[in-house]
Amino acid sequence: MHTDALPLLKADEYPGGLWYYEPHTYQPYRYVLGRVGRHPLVCIGINPSTAQPGALDPTLKSVERLANANDFDSWIMFNVYPQRATDPNDMDRVPDRALCDENLRWLQAVLAQTEPTMWLSLIHISEPT
């Protein structure tokens, strides 16, 4: 994997300490959210909700508990599609290719810049109506 073209995973100060958060401000999409460490538990979900540094949703509170209980020094959340939505009906019907490409770049960056353990979290999602 060539890392010279990948974005730099950079920690910043947010409520509660140092976080990885891409983009660095609340947007209608999110690529990366997690705690800083060298050996993270990396979880891949379907799409992000409203969570942000210092304000985790129930899913990310569970990821954080699981990482802590299993002696990981950190955790990072990714999603198959980066668009934020609390309701599947609000998601893009046709994926935005630019969002998908940037999402993959951030996943590659984390894999190249940390020593992760991957965890794929699957749930049943109905087709939006």
Language-model region placement:
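Active-site and ligand/interface coordination hotspots across diverse enzymes
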Residues: M1-D57
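Short, charged beta->alpha transition segments
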Residues: Y29-R35, N103-V110
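Charged helix-capping and loop-helix junction motifs
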Residues: P58-K61, D101-N103
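Short catalytic helix/loop segments, enriched in acidic residues and glycine
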Residues: L60-N68
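Short connector loops at secondary-structure junctions
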Residues: D73-N89
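Charged, often glycine-rich, active-site loop that binds/positions anionic groups
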Residues: R84-R105
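Hydrophobic beta-strand segments of well-ordered beta-sheets in folded domains
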Residues: T114-W119
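Residue-level detector of conserved catalytic or cofactor/ligand-binding positions
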Residues: L120-T129
